[in-house]
């Protein structure tokens, strides 16, 4: 690919995204599909665009993204994290603005495991007094 390309890895829940950024006109390709084709939900598309809108680069950069694992929400979060990291590699002066918006920090929340004797992670079986 091009030599003036920047890379960022993003993770969220069980999803991992690899994001490549290069100067262009705003094309976003995710797993060989457009953003609109890949994410049916508008909220997921919005999450993906957030870091670009924050730094006014929506129409200035082309994004090539591969993402694996998890569901729609996790993948969107992973892509956002990856875009943020790639933007920081592209221009380090954007770090402060992105940090303030909370995009730089990896969201460490994971699904809590189911425990033996319980129905779910914390849901206990119904208690009967008599």
From Swiss-Prot:
GO cellular component terms given for this protein: cytosolic small ribosomal subunit
GO molecular function: RNA binding; structural constituent of ribosome
Domain of life: Bacteria
Record bears the keyword Ribonucleoprotein: yes
InterPro entries with a match to the protein in the record: Ribosomal_Su5_D2-typ_SF, Ribosomal_uS9, Ribosomal_uS9_bac/plastid, Ribosomal_uS9_CS, Ribsml_uS5_D2-typ_fold_subgr
Keywords linked to the UniProt accession: Ribonucleoprotein, Ribosomal protein
GO biological process: translation
Family annotation (SUPFAM superfamilies): Ribosomal protein S5 domain 2-like
The family this protein is said to belong to: Belongs to the universal ribosomal protein uS9 family.
Name of the protein in question: Small ribosomal subunit protein uS9
Annotated organism of origin: Pectobacterium carotovorum subsp. carotovorum (strain PC1)
Gene: rpsI
């Amino acid at each position: 690919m091009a030599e003036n390309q920047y890379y960022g890895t993003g993770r969220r829940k069980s999803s991992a995204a690899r994001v490549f950024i290069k100067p262009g006109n705003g094309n976003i390709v995710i797993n060989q599909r457009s953003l609109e084709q890949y994410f049916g939900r508008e909220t997921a598309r919005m999450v993906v665009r957030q870091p670009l809108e924050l730094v006014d680069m929506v129409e200035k950069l082309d994004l090539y993204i591969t993402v694996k694992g998890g569901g729609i929400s996790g993948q969107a979060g992973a892509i956002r994290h990856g875009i943020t990291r790639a933007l920081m590699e592209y221009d380090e002066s954007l770090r402060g603005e992105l940090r303030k918006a909370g995009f730089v920090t990896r969201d460490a929340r994971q699904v809590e495991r189911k425990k033996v004797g319980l129905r779910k992670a914390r849901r206990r079986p119904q208690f009967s007094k008599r």
